[in-house]
Amino acid sequence: MQPVKMTGKMSFSENVNLSGDCTGDYVTCQASIEDLSIKAINSRKISVKAIVTLKLICESLQDIQMITGVDETENTDIQQLKEELEFVQLAVNQRDNFRIRENVSLPAGKPEIQEIIWDDVDVRNLNTRLADDGLKLAGDLDIFVMYIGNGETGNVQWYETTASFEGSLDISGCNADMIPYVNFQIIGKTVEERPDLDGENRDIAVEVVLDMDVKAYEERKKDVIADIYSPSYDMEIENADTQLRCLVVRNNVSSRVSGNLQLENYADLMQICNCTATVQLDDVTYKEGELVAEGVVSANVFYITSSDSQPLGSVHTIIPFAGTVKIAQISADELEYNIKPSIQQLSATI
């Protein structure tokens, strides 16, 4: 039995109630699939059900007035007590698309491609740094392709490889001394077979489009008036509380997560050909100078079986994990954190 491919798109719309009025705010939406089930209805229809989690973030910019000095006129005796404040200020807030184009070739031992029936492309080890002329990016593309081989038998073949990429985005107003905070998500990808120099379909063209959300913060210092008085006359002073951000820690932490899965109902498993995974954070708590992040790794293993009636199979597993990030002692009410979990390396063995 030869596998076939079916592709399609499902549109959806959803209204989300917000806790406050966000009119005019900068809104970002992060979507992730938590659960996906596909079942056959009949020989021509399938049922697709998914649970999509939406995370909305509303941000606004405010101008904060700080008194840095008082002009003294003649015959005035004004005493000023100044304090140096350290804070970070948003200097760059930009969204742009970054395109990655790579070509890979099948090794000599693989037959040429008749039709690609499945592909999976993921971005790993993405490194970003700010420069005076923009944002520099470098990382790896994990590419997996399953295809029907060209020949009389038309056997199922697969190929997995990693391609490195680098590039840059034009970001106005940035420099190398700023603190970058970059989020990205894949919003489009195409994987196509291409003929090589000999006219055989042995080249694979991959194009990935990343939606880049780039923010850059600038560390600032400012001398402001903490107190003021005059022995010569009474002064009415109006005070107001405000909040300023300062960077406590910016760190990359790696945690090793592993698990075993008993395949009692998958006795025909012959060889693992691909493994994919996503990370889901369930809870983040702060205690005693450290952040504790708890969540799960949702992994899917794609494998070849020895059965002629069902040559392909997959199995899903969930592996819990917990990781810690050391930070300075600070009040929990004053702490604001952003954690971006991602998969750096992934492997599955029998």
Positions of the model-derived regions?
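C-terminal beta-sandwich interaction modules and adjacent acidic
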Residues: M1-I350
